[in-house]
A protein has these predicted regions:
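Catalytic cores and adjacent flexible loops of soluble metabolic enzymes
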Residues: 1-241
Length: 241
């Protein structure tokens, strides 16, 4: 039985290569299949490997086989995965994806999802997943273990749209005003204004000045610099200094 399955899975790999595929996906169930991993590794193409049911030690062993057989570490993407259909949310353990990333510098990480809905793969994207795998079906009511945890066409479209929006939202990490919000700066911020009518030569105090919108005048951050200085002109109540 082993020899039959062994030959079949090797034939499938050869078939996929004959079709011109440039990336091969190793399913969770094959992560401990040494001959299979060695064959994939010798090809030297890009590899995605799922890690359902595996611990860090088994992942390390699989990566060692692949790299020692010829696959470059930077060409490997490791998908965190839970092989339960559907996966309970409390068993997802998305933080394990970050553990994998930290444990194996140089690899890419992603997430293979078997939960219901699209929330978890979207969250994985926000956490740094570079690849998302989600099962697809035309009808969730069909028989078989995968269909219930799969997405129908409209759901898949919604997931992809949400992921693309998250990718746009990640940004550069530099904290500065965005072009879209700059126009709101003078509206939302405040300036120092006269709390009542102020005469020329009068001393500015906490009783005759206050802070109000818009933010087109002197910033309230200069409050201490204004207090106890002398007014150079007359001000009406609410007038910007």
């Amino acid at each position: 039985m082993f020899s039959i399955r062994y030959s079949l899975i090797f034939c499938i790999v050869d078939l996929l290569l004959s079709l011109g595929l440039e990336i091969l996906k190793i399913p969770s169930g094959e992560i401990t299949n040494l001959p299979y991993l060695r064959k994939i590794g010798k090809i030297g193409c890009k590899v995605i490997i799922s890690t359902g049911m595996a611990d860090l030690g088994e992942i390390e062993d699989a990566l060692d086989v692949l790299t020692q057989s010829g696959t470059k570490l930077e060409d490997i993407t490791v998908l965190h995965c839970n092989t339960e259909y559907p996966t309970p949310f409390e068993d997802v353990n998305l933080n394990a994806m970050l553990t994998i990333k930290k444990a194996f510098p140089g690899i890419k990480v992603g997430y293979s999802d078997h939960t219901l809905g699209i929330e978890v793969p979207v969250a994985a994207t926000a956490m740094g997943a570079e690849v998302i795998e989600k099962h697809f079906t035309l009808d969730k009511s069909m028989k078989g273990p995968d269909h219930r945890a799969s997405l129908e066409p409209d759901e898949l479209k919604a997931m992809v749209k949400a992921i693309r929006n998250i990718e746009k939202s990640m940004g550069t990490g530099i904290k500065k005003p965005s072009p879209s919000e700059l126009k709101n700066k003078p509206i939302a911020r405040k300036s120092i204004v006269a709390a009542r009518d102020i005469k020329k030569g009068e001393i500015f105090t906490e009783d005759n000045i206050t802070v109000k919108r818009p933010g087109t005048g002197i910033s309230p951050m200069q409050w201490d610099e204004i207090i106890n200085t002398i007014s150079s002109k007359n001000y009406q109540e609410d007038e910007l200094l």
